[in-house]
Amino acid sequence: MLQEHYFYIIDDQYFIDFPDTYLRGNHQENRPHYFAFQEPSNPGIFWVVPLSSRIQKYRSIIQKKEATGKSCDTLHIMDVAGKEEVFLIQDMFPIVERYIKREYTISGIPLKLLNENDIKTIRKKVNKVYNLLIRGIKFMPTQPNVMKIRDELLKRIAVEEVLSLKEIAATSDNQSES
């Protein structure tokens, strides 16, 4: 089971099943993703935030935005396990558990974000971006169509639930006949 504030590696199959030009590349299952939250209304849907080590590129974007007097809720730079990383909140996407390849580990230890202030800051930014996405607001020209992916994931969850119920019914019918 996924745990909030841990980092995970996404299976490449996700990017095959949901091809979107603007989804961040998975770097051969080496890009860590931060598990931000589980959807309250759809507990099978999890939202993850890709990370990047391209600090200068994103620091420049943040500085330009802040120079205009605006805050930057789409990106967040912080230290993760002794290394600066960028949380690409603008590129967060929904996922289901079967597409999680494994926990992201350092020296065999699963990486977890522990600093409560960092968790609150990221959560606040994630909530803002999620609310924009839910309302269908396009805020980036290179924004992946994550709501289309979410809808497809919800359809797949519904199909799996129906198939599971049919299996249960078939099993109980077989046991009744015995």
Model-identified regions with their sequence ranges:
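C-terminal terminal-subdomain/extension
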Residues: I62-S178
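Sequence-level motif detector for i,i+2 pairs with an aromatic at +2
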Residues: Q3-H5, P43, E84
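GIY-YIG nuclease catalytic motif and its immediate N-terminal context
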Residues: M1-N30
